[in-house]
């Protein structure tokens, strides 16, 4: 297996984490892979000429474009965001090569949006392959609850709701703050909301916390390197995003066996459903009710159920098994027509 990174500087750390027989960094800047990408196509052709390959996996639209034009191989194109086929040119390209192309969305939500954009495609060529984590590797990085709280400067005994993500409209931390405000009167007085991350709304969100009268109960940590190491500092993890394509941070929270509260939209809801609490996006009253429910249930958290769902649906092993069982992939391995 050969893995090629179109963009980014060479990195030994990335190469080691890639788990590939060979890792090649082409070193393009993002601005250099706009347009026709003829040089990148030529380089991929040179790489392909050195060996015998069964198929190509391409993450996102630009690598898919390069893979399709550089080879005659079947291409498995993985999509991590919505509206990847909003442009006519992208729809035209994949329609041109439909006979040797499988599209995978990282959630049913992304998959369904692609199917709506490409209504003439058979459903068997637009499927779901969830994101995944190495559960044991992630868990090995966690600090203990006490150590994590000490590092973040948090009190040892407070009940803490955690949120991790960019401070951006898409993450809707404004609803998170309002929901916490609504719940706080029924929570212990020393309860905290901890928001880990930075972004363009940092100043506005801090002002909102002041306006709501909860600034003393909200901690903005800013960016924290290797933030997931400190997830055990939290008692509950809350994600309030608007139509999240997936929500990798939820998997990391599940690895810490944290109770989950999530907006009922996008891929995040698919991750949480069955082991967490969902609320309508933007509904701070419903979010407050979820927070209170999690507090009242704090002695009865079913950590085993959370970890079981993580292992069975979103672990490396589960997603790898799902990939090799995809009908498109099975036909490739059996040298059957796709």
What are these regions (language model features)?
Residues 223, 242:
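Aromatic "clamp/platform" in nucleotide-sugar-dependent glycosyltransferases that forms part
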Residues 159, 163-184, 200-207, 285:
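A conserved mid-protein helix/loop that constitutes part of the nucleotide-sugar donor-binding site
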Residues 57-64, 79:
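Short His-centered aromatic/hydrophobic patch
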Residues 101-127, 133-138:
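A short, active-site helix/loop in glycosyltransferases that binds the activated sugar's phosphate group
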Residues 274-284, 293-299:
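Conserved acidic donor-binding segment of nucleotide-sugar-dependent glycosyltransferases
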Residues 1-36:
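N-terminal strand-loop element at the rim of the active site
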Residues 4-5, 259-262:
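Short hydrophobic beta-strand element within catalytic cores of glycosyltransferases
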Residues 76-106:
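A conserved, positively charged/aromatic
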